[in-house]
């Protein structure tokens, strides 16, 4: 149970880190697509 709890904490931390990065990346991709048009 302790291992599962730790895994959950790690997942939450990774999500906190990667969520803004991936959304910013999506915005950049959208911008470059608009630019090429």
From Swiss-Prot:
UniProt note on tissues of expression: Hemolymph.
A GO term for molecular function: oxygen carrier activity
Principal localisation: secreted
Superkingdom field: Eukaryota
Localization terms from the record: Secreted, Extracellular space
Keyword Thylakoid assigned: no
GO cellular component: extracellular region
Keyword terms, alphabetized: Copper, Oxygen transport, Secreted, Transport
One annotated GO biological process: oxygen transport
Cited function: Hemocyanins are copper-containing oxygen carriers occurring freely dissolved in the hemolymph of many mollusks and arthropods.
Family affiliation: Belongs to the tyrosinase family. Hemocyanin subfamily.
Protein name, per record: Hemocyanin subunit B
Species the sequence originates in: Cancer pagurus (Rock crab)
